Amino acid sequence: YRGLAPTGRAAKVFSHHAGVPAYTIHRIIYRQQTFQGEGTRFSLGFNKLRHALFVVDEASMISSGVGSMGDSLFGTGELMDDLIRYVYSGEGCRLLLVGDTAQLPPVGEEDSPALRNDVLQRYGLLVGSADLTEVVRQSSESDVLSGATLLRNLLNEGFEGIPPIHTDPKGEVRALPGNELIESLVSDYQSFGADNVIVVTRSNKRANIYNNGIRSRIFDREEELTRNDLIMAVKNNYFWTAECAKSLGKDERM
């Protein structure tokens, strides 16, 4: 079989946990073509494998249209269409999509089309699905798991509005006043290290505000770029050549 994922980071995680090679969808299904006067594009390739199973992790990220993971530079611009066409162009090949319906859908989508049976059936596919309910990454007594399970159940019930979040001053999930945030972050950075502390926000705008505040008030860095800063690659370069000594994938840090 062949392991795939929408992003380089997801492919690395897949490969690490599965113990087998995994690649980005784009790397496997597209091939580079150069057109005179039009620059370089990537056309859909042909699946030469026979009777192979393609396992795609993080399938909730796969878009059904241009934008997000869909890009007019690649094939038809609709990643999901291209993926299905590629896989089933090979003799006897099958597709297994693995993902979490509770995660955020692709940009511009109300839900994750690659995880919907009715959407997949429109391609003329015989579709089977199953929900995995046993949690193996966290303790069954975890406050974080309890909160996540509550939110998932509310989503399944069609709940609308602001969901309740249960907190415990001495537990894993605590309500923290804004004026105590900086002090708490400083303590966590000192105790666990910067790589093990994550601030999650509801928007990119809010994330930038937090990042700038943490950078200036906790790490005392005012310049745009200083020594020991973490730099993240936010866009893949599909024109990379072997002349480069080292490359970074999207979302990787250096």
Which residues fall in each region the model found?
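ASCE P-loop NTPase helicase motor core
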Residues: 1-161
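Conserved helicase motor core of P-loop NTPases
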Residues: 78, 86-93, 101-253
